[in-house]
Amino acid sequence: MLRFLAPRLLSLQGRTARYSSAAALPSPILNPDIPYNQLFINNEWQDAVSKKTFPTVNPTTGEVIGHVAEGDRADVDRAVKAAREAFRLGSPWRRMDASERGRLLNRLADLVERDRVYLASLETLDNGKPFQESYALDLDEVIKVYRYFAGWADKWHGKTIPMDGQHFCFTRHEPVGVCGQIIPWNFPLVMQGWKLAPALATGNTVVMKVAEQTPLSALYLASLIKEAGFPPGVVNIITGYGPTAGAAIAQHVDVDKVAFTGSTEVGHLIQKAAGDSNLKRVTLELGGKSPSIVLADADMEHAVEQCHEALFFNMGQCCCAGSRTFVEESIYNEFLERTVEKAKQRKVGNPFELDTQQGPQVDKEQFERVLGYIQLGQKEGAKLLCGGERFGERGFFIKPTVFGGVQDDMRIAKEEIFGPVQPLFKFKKIEEVVERANNTRYGLAAAVFTRDLDKAMYFTQALQAGTVWVNTYNIVTCHTPFGGFKESGNGRELGEDGLKAYTEVKTVTIKVPQKNS
């Protein structure tokens, strides 16, 4: 699962080049205040109707940070009602100039930039990702995505069409309406920006359900939405669980569209709920088992580095992680040796320390899931070359893990692990590896490493994936569409294509007395 703005998953050194010394990075706030723990509905902070709360946990220590409101169906109803009222004809939001919507988004970006250190610290506390990545990558991307779509606000429009006969015809791009958005825990602020920015730029209203594992940064951003000047009801933020609050959004007959980022299994449920309710529009960005293919003529050092970061970045918790590394037979042994050495050198530890490269998994459930897959890989006959166990005595840390001798029919080769586990495969021929790479239910991303342009172009056409990288990995910007083939989802986010998901095209035809060219 996520993304945006500045190139994302380059080597740690490359990704944080502007902050190449500890002095260049600001010091994190180790114990940030938590001012917001309620639901944000109609620009007001409210308790859940049930008065229930649930804990959010620091994955570095396993200790509870605090409790937030547990929203459910009744709260979703309140939020949808507020969003519907904000979207009614003649409301301040509907009457607002498109350029003013863009100004509000730019104002929101300004406020995020003002509070960047605090937001990055909050993200690291609640999610566990290294602070230097929260600050230098995620927050950079968040700011840019709001600014990018702010620029689109008054430039997304229809066109005139030269019809036959005495008619004048034009199209309008109108907002879909009330948009339900359900975001994941691996990139909380980034995913919030991916969904909010295009929806607001095109004039929609939003009911967003944030991940129960990482609610804190999204709630703080809600306070910035109010400070920026968005009218009441335009953005509503619900904290709660997927089977209750998330399901209520997907099933709600007064929600016009739902956008979801998360697992393929839940994506199936959301698609079904949309069909069973009001046939609401659906955008899904789901799981992946993305291949990285290394040919014998590739720059070995560069390919090792890129394939390492493609998998281990964000603790392996990326929907587009390069979780199947295919290496041509003639260089396989050397590549494997270098890969293992690279994994052993990766620094795991306290994410608030500025030289940490890998923090904990997001929660106990993910921690146990990943360890379970490691045990399964060993049981199935893959060769464990490094890692494979817990790091430290508390928190949810796992040592960077590399498997060799992996076969395509093993579960670690087919299923999304979503953790720091890199399986390596050997191949002989290009046609063979293309067939194997495509032999998956997923199709989110892929990469090929080669110096041969003809081979590179062949792979870009042959691989079944929404994004194909050549000699790099995880370069995702706010200008470029992102989404998957097959069971990795439908629709696209980001770029001009990302706006299409949030508008309806209306055709207007007018009878005229006389038409002139």
Swiss-Prot record:
Pfam families assigned to the protein according to its UniProt record, in alphabetical order: Aldedh
A Gene Ontology BP annotation from the UniProt entry: ethanol catabolic process
Modified residues (N6-acetyllysine): 51-52, 364, 383, 399, 414, 426, 429
EC number: 1.2.1.3
Family matches, as Gene3D superfamilies: Aldehyde Dehydrogenase, Chain A, domain 1, Aldehyde Dehydrogenase, Chain A, domain 2
Enzyme class, UniProt record, top EC level: oxidoreductase
Subcellular location as annotated: Mitochondrion matrix
Classification via InterPro entries: Ald_DH/histidinol_DH, Ald_DH_C, Ald_DH_CS_CYS, Ald_DH_CS_GLU, Ald_DH_N, Aldehyde_DH_dom
One of the record's GO cellular component terms: mitochondrion
Tissues in which the protein is found: Liver, testis and to a lesser extent in brain.
Pathway involvement of the protein, from the record: Alcohol metabolism; ethanol degradation; acetate from ethanol: step 2/2
Active site as annotated: 285, 319
CDD domains listed in its UniProt record: ALDH_F1AB_F2_RALDH1
Catalytic reaction annotation: an aldehyde + NAD(+) + H2O = a carboxylate + NADH + 2 H(+)
Modified residues (N6-succinyllysine): 52, 81, 364, 383, 399, 414, 426
Keywords: Acetylation, Mitochondrion, NAD, Oxidoreductase, Transit peptide
GO molecular function: aldehyde dehydrogenase (NAD+) activity; NAD binding
Source domain of life: Eukaryota
Record's subunit section: Homotetramer.
Task of the protein: ALDHs play a major role in the detoxification of alcohol-derived acetaldehyde. They are involved in the metabolism of corticosteroids, biogenic amines, neurotransmitters, and lipid peroxidation.
Family, per entry: Belongs to the aldehyde dehydrogenase family.
Alphabetized PANTHER family for the sequence: ALDEHYDE DEHYDROGENASE-RELATED
Identification of the protein by name: Aldehyde dehydrogenase X, mitochondrial
Native organism: Homo sapiens (Human)
Lineage: Eukaryota, Metazoa, Chordata, Craniata, Vertebrata
